Structures are given as C-alpha cells and as structure tokens.
Amino acid sequence: MPSRTESRPVRVLLIEDEPTDLARVNRVLDQAASSFTVRAVPEVRAAATELGARSYDLVLLGLARAEIGDGDGFEAIRRLGKTAPVIVLSRLDDEDIAVKAVQRGAQDYLVKDRLTVDLLVRSIRYARERHRLLAEQNRRLEHELKIAAFVQQSFLPGRVPEVPGHDIGAHLHSSGQVGGDFYDFIDLPPDRVAIAVGDASGKGIPGAILMAETQGVLRAEAASCATPIELVRTLNRALLHDQDQDRFVTLFYGVLAFPTGRFTFVNAGHPRALLLDGATESTLVSTGPPLRLFADAAWEEKTVTLHAGARLVIYSDGVTEAQDDTERFFDLEGVRAVMTESPDRPAVELARDLCHAAEEFERGSPDPGDDKTVVVIRSR
C-alpha cells in the first residue's frame, strides 16, 4: 500500500450499481489521508473490459443479494482476482458468505453499512500487500515447475522399443503442477523388454527429484535382476536411504517376453492396469504396497499371457482420478470406453487418446488435476 508520500494515487476500480452505496464509498475514500483515484462501473462485464484496457491497484466489488444467491458474484471474484486484489462490499453480514468470498480469491469482505475510513484504508493496504506476496510466490512456483518439467521430460525414454509381435505406445501429459509421473522401457536381450510406469509422490522439484532417483536406480539394476520382483525389492532398498517416510513411489513394473507373449509383473501400489483380450476383461491389481514405505514390504509376482489382439493399458492415477465439474471421476469406465471405441488403432494413438479424453473430462473442474501417463501394449 502506498504511503502518504507515494508519488501517485492508488487506482481503484469500483463495481457498484447502487447510487447510494456508490456515494458512500466515494465519500469514505475522499476522507482518507491516502490519495485514491476511483473509477466506477455498474457491472462485472464492464469491469473486465476496464481491467483489460487500464491498470488498477485494487478492485472494490459491490455484491447484491441476488448475485450471491446464484453464485455469479463468487465467479466474478475468481475472475477479477487474477488481475488485481479484490475486496468485496456487501450489505449482508454473513460469515459463511464472507468465508466463501475469501476462498474464491477475495482479500477481504466488508459490510457496507459498517464502512469507515480507517477500516477501508486498512483493508486496502493489507489486500494489496497480500496480493503482492501471492504474486511473488506464484512466480517462484512457476520457475520451480519449469525446472521440474525439464527434469521430468529429460528422463523420458528417447524411443519406444520395437517389439516383434507387439505394438507399444506411450504418452505423458504434464499438468500445470508437474508431479512425479514417469514411464520407461529397458531392453533385456535377447528377447525381453521391461516396461515401467510410476508415480513419485510430491509436486514440483521434490516430486521430480524422487522420480529421477527412481528411474536412475531402475535403469541401473533392471538388467541384473532376474525377475520383476527382484527388481522391485532392489529398488525399494535403494530408495529407503533417508528418513523422509512421507514420500513414496507407486510402480507398475513388468517384463514382456516376445516369443510367448508372457508378461510377468509386480504392481507396487499403482492403479490397476486393464487387460482386454477378446471378449475377456481383467485388471492387473496391486500386488503389494508402494515403494519407499517399508523395509520389510512384500510383493507378489504375477504372469498373464498377451494373446493376439489383446490390449494392455497401464496408466497413472491422474487418468482415473480426473474429475469433472460435478466431482465425478473418469475412473476405469472412462479407460474402458476409450480402449474399446477404436481397438485397432496404433498403440501410441490409443495412449494419446486416453490422456486427451481424461483432460477433456476435467476441463470444467476448478482442480487442474494431476499428471497423466499411459502405456499401451497391443499384441498382434
């Protein structure tokens, strides 16, 4: 907030269509020792246009009872708060409404009939400072997420292996938050390939670091481990080197033998994979806990056969836990719908289509969602 000696007045955009309330707010600001310039508009649409054309230090949003009742007022707070700090002015002295307004992004909620010079000036000062600190925090977070995204992308395999008798495709969509999703393929000569899909807990740099550490150990140890369960045990021991037990990794790790189509896997706390084989459907559920939680953890190794025409889809929880604006989950039904709509499409297209379908599903949700990773194996 500017001091009394600041070189320019505080630019205030007032959204108010009640003449009496408009006069009251102007009168209060005129009495303040600080200098303000106020431009008033009668509605949110006009305010959005004004904010696009000029720079303002603060928005005072007068909300009527009807706007609060139908939710339009709260939506206005969310939109306007992206541009400038918002203080809500209302005739309603309602604590629940005040809390909702702040949750949607308002810096303060003031009752019009109780408005005083000191109260409004203090609220403006604090609102501007909180908005400034939040903007700085968001800039730091954005920088961190760019680093995390770079780490995540740099650890993805450069190519998808060409496997006789099988078509393999993969796709990873990073959310704005960037989690610890990853996938990997490791050649195991002469006739096997290892396939991994994992999710390291945490967002930003912490999740990216744990993801990178997990993939590093996986790549270093896969060739020397005779079975998937041996690899998972080795990986768990390697990741348990510190005391940060709040962090963990879910992992679906399997080895595909080309000639037979036998797929041996361990599911360490990861979402169940979906196997569609002709008219038969089965899920490859968790066979043990996530990695990095327990030194004495136990897992079970299982084997399935991928017959000609079978499709196996392995995905991260960002796919099935995608939510629409009614908080309904994409879930396994969404995965099944995409995989059965065009079953003969190339694996890479199926993987990409599934990620995109989950993204579209949650488009209207206020939650940005999680990373989405999909690996598809089609047997010919």
Q: How would you describe each model-predicted region?
A:
Residues 7-21, 25-29, 40-41, 47, ...:
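Conserved acidic segment of CheY-like receiver
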Residues 71-72, 92-110, 114:
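Alpha4 helix (beta4-alpha4-beta5 surface) of REC/receiver domains from two-component response regulators
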Residues 119-131, 217:
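Receiver (REC) domain switch/output surface
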Residues 126-141, 332:
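Interdomain signal-transducing alpha-helical coiled-coil linkers
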Residues 33, 52-54, 76-83, 104:
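Conserved phosphotransfer cores of two-component systems
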Residues 252, 305-314, 319-380:
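C-terminal catalytic subdomain
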Residues 44-47, 57-80, 93-95:
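Conserved phosphotransfer microenvironments
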